[in-house]
C-alpha cells in the first residue's frame, strides 16, 4: 500500500478539483479537501466540490474568470504562504489539473521561497472530460498521433501569439482551453497555416456538468458557430480528425440541453453560413 499523504499543519497542497463533476475528483483530492483548515479555491470550483470541506474550514474565493479577477496572482501567493506560516492546513483548490494552465509554478515558487512544504495532487483536466462527454478519443491510431494543449487566454491588450505552423498539424488533436472568445482568431490562423477548413471541431461548454453543451462544427465555420451555439460558461475547443469518430448520437442528446432559442439562432447562423460557403450544416 502506498503511504497515505495527509495535509499537515503548515503545509500547502495544490489540489486538482477536476472539470466540475464532484464524482470526477480523485479519492485523494476528496480526502485532502476534507482535511484542510483553509481552502483557497478558483471560481470554477463548484458547490458540489466545496461541500466536501470540513464544516470548520475557511473557504476563500480567489478565482479569476474572463478578466474578472477577485485576486491577482501575487496576492494569492501571499495568502497561501501566510496561511501556511500561521500553521494552517492549506489546500489551494484549482479547476482541472493544477499543472495544466493552473499557474502552479508561481505558487510552488512562492511556497518554496518561504520555506513552506508544498505538494501537488493531480486532477482530471477539462480536455479529458470534454472527450468523454462527446464519446470520442483524443488520439486515434494511424490518424491522430499527437495531442496538444494550448490556452487561448492572452493578457489584456495583447494579441494571442502561438506557433500556428506547428499547431496546424493534420495528425494531431488540438485542445484549446479558454477558446470561446478567441474562436475566430484560432480558426483563421490555423487555416492560414494550412489546416483544412473541413477539419472537425467540437465546442464543449461546462464539460462534465449537468448543463454541459456540445456543438459539432468544422474549422471554417467555427467563428460563426461559437457565437451562436454557446452560453457564458467555460468552453473548450477540440480540433482534429479524431473528432470524426465522436459518438454523434450522444452529442445529439447533449445538444438538447441548449438554452431556449439557441436552436433557432443556430439555424439563422447556418443560413448566413450557407450564403458564403454553400453548406447548410456545420456538423461533421
Q: What is each model feature region?
A:
Residues 49-50, 111, 130-131, 186, ...:
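Hydrophobic packing residues within well-ordered alpha-helices of enzyme cores
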Residues 19, 44-46, 62-69, 124-126, ...:
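Short, acidic/turn-prone active-site loops that include or flank metal/cofactor-
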Residues 24, 28, 34, 44, ...:
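Conserved active-site and cofactor/substrate-binding residues in soluble primary-metabolism enzymes
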Residues 2-3, 9-12, 85-90, 146, ...:
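A contiguous loop/helix-start segment that scaffolds small-molecule binding in enzyme catalytic cores
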Residues 57-64, 115-119, 138-148, 194-203:
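Short hydrophobic/aromatic-enriched beta-strand-loop microsegments
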Residues 1-22, 27-121, 223-224, 228:
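Class I S-adenosyl-L-methionine
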Residues 41, 94, 122, 151, ...:
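Short beta-strand/turn micro-motifs composed of small residues
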Residues 2-3, 97-170, 213-216, 284:
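Class I SAM-dependent methyltransferase SAM-binding "motif I" and its flanking Rossmann-like core
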